[in-house]
Curated annotation (Swiss-Prot):
Gene encoding the protein: rpoC
Residues engaged in binding Zn(2+) 2: C808, C882, C889, C892
Name of the protein in question: DNA-directed RNA polymerase subunit beta'
Function in brief: DNA-dependent RNA polymerase catalyzes the transcription of DNA into RNA using the four ribonucleoside triphosphates as substrates.
InterPro entries: DNA-dir_RpoC_beta_prime, DNA-dir_RpoC_beta_prime_bact, RNA_pol_asu, RNA_pol_N, RNA_pol_Rpb1_1, RNA_pol_Rpb1_3, RNA_pol_Rpb1_3_sf, RNA_pol_Rpb1_4
Species: Rickettsia canadensis (strain McKiel)
Residues at which Zn(2+) 1 binds: C69, C71, C84, C87
Organism taxonomic ancestry: Bacteria, Pseudomonadati, Pseudomonadota, Alphaproteobacteria, Rickettsiales
Gene3D superfamilies, per the entry: 1.10.132.30, 1.10.150.390, 1.10.1790.20, 1.10.40.90, 2.40.40.20, 2.40.50.100, RNA polymerase II, clamp domain, RNA polymerase Rpb1, domain 3
Amino acid sequence: MSLVNFYGQLSNTQQFDQIRINIASPDQVRSWSFGEVTKPETINYRTFKPEKDGLFCARIFGPVKDYECLCGKYKRMKNRGIICEKCGVEVTVSRVRRERMGHIELAAPIAHIWFLKSLPSRISTLLDMTMRDLEKILYFENYVVLDPGLSILQKGELLTEEELQKAKDKYGEDAFTASIGAEVIQQMLKDLDFAKLKQELYEELQNTTSEVKKKKLVKRLKLVEDFLESENKPEWMIIDVLPVIPPEIRPLVMLDGGRFATSDLNELYRRVINRNNRLKKLIESKAPDIIVRNEKRMLQEAVDALFDNGRRGRAAKNANKRPFKSLSDMLKGKQGRFRQNLLGKRVDYSGRSVIVVGPELKLHQCGLPKKMALELFKPFIYSKLELYGIATTIKAAKRMVEAEKPEVWDVLEEVIREHPVLLNRAPTLHRLGIQAFEPLLIEGKAIQLHPLVCAAFNADFDGDQMAVHIPLSIEAQLEARVFMMSTNNILSPANGRPIIVPDKDIVLGLYYLTIAFDNEVGEGLMFSDLAEMEHALYNKFITIHTKIKYRRNQLNAEGKMVPVIVDTTYGRLMVGELLPSNPNIEFKFINKQLTKKDISLVIDLVYRHCGQKATVIFADQLMKLGFKYACSSGISFGMDDMVVPESKSTHINETQLEIKEFEQQYSNGLITYGEKYNKVVDAWSRCTDRVANDMMKEIATPPINDEPNHQKINAIYMMAVSGARGSFQQIKQLGGMRGLMTKSNGQIIQTPIISNFKEGLTEFECFNSANGMRKGQIDTALKTASSGYLTRKLVDVAQDCIITEKDCGTDKGIEVKSVIEGGEVIVSLAEKILGRTAAIDIFHPVTNDLILNKGELINEVKLEQIESAGLDRIMIKSVLTCESTTGICSICYGRDLATGTLVSEGEAIGVIAAQSIGEPGTQLTMRTFHIGGAATKGAEISSVEASYDAKVKIISRNVVINSEERKIVMSRNCELLLLDNNGNEKARHKIPYGARLLVDDGDMVIKTQKLAEWDPYTIPIITEKSGKVLFKDMVEGISIRDVTDEATGIPSKVIIESKQYSRGAELRPRIQLLDAKGEVITLSNGLEARYYLPVGAVLSVEDGVQISVGDIIARIPKESTTTKDITGGLPRVAELVEARRPKDHAVIAEVDGRVEFGKDYKSKRRIIIHPIDETMSIEYMVPKGKHVVVNEGDFVKKGDLLIDGNPVLQDILKVMGVEVLANYIVKEVQAVYRLQGVKIDDKHIEVIIRQMLQKVEITDSGGTTLLVGEKVDRHEFDEINEKAIKNGLKPAEAQLILQGITKASLQTRSFISAASFQETTRVLTEAAIAGKVDKLRGLKENVIVGRLVPAGTGYFMDKMRKAAVKLDEENSINADKG
């Protein structure tokens, strides 16, 4: 027996390994066809039978009824295969009407619109004509010269009717040949000699220098090569024979009342047939040319409409003025074939209902309504009833089930025992949106859901619905139990933290239970036994909050029980009782007021040390305990729980005074409107925070009251602090002040809402707040769609990323260190490396002991060793450096976050990465509207304080002492480090240019000491020498203007764009410093003291005044701040993964060198960098309005910013390489999510970046057939080079390019996957010309062709089947030999 048969018979979808797409030749179309359709009729209106030779003809497409010919002469199975001599119909199954095709012989050739109009037009590229010219020929406007003969006309020249007539008169009728219509295009395509054309183009490419021409030639050459390789003939792009798709795919159905509904395709086909028949008649009757041509043009338009309606000219519309759905529309978009029917199918054995909470369920259970279960498990019930002899036949069983006989329920109980069902809540944003549960039969009509899985499903019980699906086969049930059971999905695949964490009421209950109150009855009593305590509690000697001492047995490291005395409360001991005994899980972890965070940590600990089963039991018991005490505590809140702090009015008055001062400064012209706005907004932000802090303090310490029933702790405070419900933000609005509101465009309104919800809002405040609330609502509506789209794009780009091997054997890796921002460690090294593998052997820096072997997984134990060794950076393996040719290897990926072990082969990590990044995006958009538009913007940072007692070290210290004896920072990249006693870096702060430095290098500072301060709203321009000011190129009204503020009437001088004036073109406004002799001062770097002023700079000095060192001569105002929320964030993530150029992007230095300003060009400034190694200097042209962050003579390092802004990703890749680029993208994406408190593992982002870096651009073709500028897949490039080296040729050279995810998805190796993503027609056109082969490696293409996906179980089945085939072949060879 062959091994392959062991896997059962291969289904149709498994009998092929790859799919190829080509252009169909006329002969192929005829070979598919079962007959020609010559009549436009569909069915006979009296008999309702298909018309002969019409669009539904039974002779061509097959019988309408199974095994019955049209006239009824032959019926039943016995006659199968007979062709009726009367009506000509073959007696067979009617299903063939879905498979058999027909054809239409066109009376004139027609250009296929996809090859003509789908940009770039393939026909026009091949013939080297413009699209307009082509259309003129095809639609019978102009003639084209095919052979100039004896005339002086050019080949391919276009002639109008008159010009043709003139030429004929001039040269004679037969002197040249010119023709019109699709026939001539077909002839021209036929005449192309590709081998010769390729040679000519190649030579031309070598000789040309024009970039535009090169691009055009490369395009044409690529197309020629595609045709040569795919063996497609170019004349097939012009159609002679039109295929007619099977009738069942374009059905005609009868509605009630005798009317018919038909597919649009039938109407489009009818038009084609009508026009074709008319054209045939006209040609036969030798009608005048002009009429025939008009008919040909109409036929061309009819075929265009059939293939792609609306692509050219006006779309063909039906009686209701709605455009017809053409063949292209059937494939395109969400409702098209790919996405509607192939990627998303509706399934049988499923149902949906509303969900309700099921607190008494176990974690692996769900409650399924009896009615639903009866319907869903019908086939199982039928077979059981028959098996037990309760019903004699299936029909009898069916009747019993419909009557709902008592024995049916007993059988149902048995059928569903241990038969898992899948529950799914839409939208399924990550894989935890579908989980398996064992059903329990319940009365009622709602599905009961376990409270702990709500977080994973993102479900609540306000009317949410869920769908139930039944896994039918034993394999499906097995997979559901092993992979999808809720108890097997405790950790989140996005960050490896537990996702089964108590929430809301449970947290509140546990928090209440673990509170310890002072002066409670029975304080200080000692107990050694829980039963004794229970007795005391029952008799009211103690309460659950009384502080007591208790002797508790604890497991030590040797595994022995040791008694310890702990200070605790009865409530905490109840939680302690649930803890599994393990030496690593100490009582101290729960001997405190438990907040949501603490509970999460405890669950994580239990999972890491005691395994999954213990965790599930622990979580379930915690939940029951939490619910019990949330109920018995009776916590709720009323009006009095919202406390308005007494200090509120004081804070508000102070702030109003502060703002009056700003107004005054603004009126005096000391600050600009933008600065005033920023200062006002900041002042109110601070005020709101102060009021809120005072309120929180008051809530946290309720008034002392000796009444017995007095509530000892504020309910609102309890809810917020425990993490059960509500946030600091919301409570601030209830009892503090609502604060600043945002406008719909993200701008902050200057006047805050001083009232809170307890006091009530004034009419004006109400209006203002409606503005903000509306913003929240709109955000939710709009952003959810764009977030879903982002997820879809991510899934598409990463879907074929699968773990395919254990180790790729690479030595490469990336270096990681902790993320420090504003002097604080935001993400520790430990967080970044946990679950990754070491790229090199790692040794202890002091003892030199080996901590980690290369390729070893960094787990919690190893992490402690690394931390104690004090390592601050580590080389780890990454998917970015993985060298597997298909997919990724386990070692480079590291730990599978959902299981905590090394990732196994076949895991679809690409999809998991996409879901992990996309899912929080959707959640965050929905979060905004809960705050109701209150602005969440921290005050701008304007100083740094020491976060530790430490020693100061200043890097690139360049300071001047100004007239007020203050140290002013003049360096652009000054950094201040805080070092501990051993000289290790504890914090790092960037000190901006123009800041006042309050400490010096080597100083010792204490915690909270101020180190430096600066104005956060302006960028100053500061002098480093004293001297006399001289204005240069400042012409009033051309390069500088007195701007008088409307509100204050104070004028200030502002630099303006000078390009609108002819004489202003060369102006470069600048300030020079003169010494006493009137000569320009020379600075320390040897250059003259010249300060160029960008557009928008506000002057702080007058011409001719004397200034001293460190004075500000001009200020550049910064843009006003808008709120930071995920709205700013999601588009930022999209911008990064789409690799778009940011709006005001930065310019980065490509080399180390000195800066010089060159001669300006029109509206651009010229920045020149002279490299240290004295190679060619590099020029940058930047718009004049942009703020240049370097000065003339500054020394810049490779990668430094020359202009403020976000750098362009492609520049980072080019200048700094892959690792720096990856670090930058990871850092930026993480910053967006971190702002919202979402944790995503770095490796997910790295997977996406890997997919963005799939292609290389050829810089030198060497001895290969690749073209310079062509973009090819990295692995293909390596394969081509290997071949070249084998054949003794020079390998090609290329550089890595970064593609956005949409582009990367569309250029994936699989055309099926790309076509189902976007731009379906373009992808299919390209693929058909190149004769592309889809190897069916990714997930999408396999789903589309109806196979198991090559991931998980499918991956191994595939692997084993391939091995079986190989062994079978070997066995058969051996047998033959034998």
